[in-house]
Amino acid sequence: MCLRNRILASLFTFLFLCFLSAQLTAQAGAIKPDPLASEIDPHCRTRPIDLVICLDTSGSMEGLIDSARARLWDIVNSLAKARPLPQLRVGLITYGSPSRSNAANGWLVKQTDLTTDLDTVYAKMMSLRTDGGDEFVGWAMRRALDWMQWSNDPQALKLVFIAGNESADQASEVFNFRYVGEEARNRGITVNSIYCGDREVGVRERWDQVAACGGGSYSAIDMRCGTIQIETPQDKVLLELNLKLNATYVPYGSLGEAGRERQLDQDRNADRIGIASSASRAEAKASKLYDNSGWDLVDGVKNKRVAVKDLKGSDLPAAMQALPAEKREEFVETQFRARADIQKQIAEVSASREQFLRDARAQSSGGKQALDEVMIDALRTQAKAKGFKFD
């Protein structure tokens, strides 16, 4: 009798999951507008966007990691065109790498919490290495919900993008992506899935259901597309402007010199990938999403994180320490004006570069999409449903 009850219970659970999957798949194609979006003040200056990226770092995913490194700044640049201006925070989780985690933790690593410090995220991304391992999609989704300090703002756009190429049902007895996806939706977090390979194979591996359960979009990419560097006539101009932009940063406090060195390190990392990545990074650095208030005095004063008069002389760079107190604020104001002028020049050159890239990609893509393209498409669709508009 007990055996019969267990069989009936298992059958009921299987049928329920089939029904739930069918219902969610049917709903996946349409992103419904958020009812709160109509209440958004169009004059609101900023609104939060929390973006968590979960990357498979198992042995076959080198192309995915390279795509993420090459295209992070393109994704930032797309969001910089949203209105109201996003207050962007990015978090990074990796899964499937046994040398950097353990079985008890599902082979997952929290690389960064949600942060506005995009250079820190990029530095972590550049340090990633792949090796063989098990890829537990449901577990990665679970940790994305639990590990990150998500915004409590009801008007925040909260997104997860999870990318990989193995069955999404691995270790489902521990964390089933169907239940985790439903919880994410109930918490206002949208889960998008990206399969690295053929779209139909991704469907067989249940990656479309990951997005369906999480209320997001399913995409399949050719990992090689994301690493192609398209050079433009504007790239060298942007690199020259980037050097001038760097000269306007004023490190302060205990984090100042480390922050400045990290910024320069990430310039060098982008340069190693290619001139196109460096140009995209220069555009991102000139946007309002690139905020270094924690270590740069110009950003800190502009965003009211710090006041020059409250800082001790030892907290200031040598160039400012030599100035009388009344001249220090004038020094920061001069740097602010110089930066604003350079940012304007970068924006103008970047607009021409973007048109060149659109034309080049239309001719060369062959219908295949890269990582940044599918992420940007989903981001824009879901941001518009939340009340954002794009230039």
Predicted segments with their positions:
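Eukaryote-biased recognition of electropositive, low-complexity segments
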Residues: F177-G181, R187-I189, E200-N303
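Alpha-helical, heptad-rich or low-complexity scaffold/stalk segments
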Residues: I53, E326-K327, F331
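Bacterial N-terminal signal peptides
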Residues: S10-Q23
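Divalent cation-coordinating acidic motifs and surrounding scaffolds
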Residues: Q27-G226, T232-D235, N303-G313, A319-Q321, ...
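Bacterial N-terminal signal peptides that target proteins for export
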Residues: M1-F12
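A general alpha-helix detector
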Residues: D315-L316, K327
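Nucleic-acid enzyme cleavage-core boundary/entry regions
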Residues: C2, A22-A28
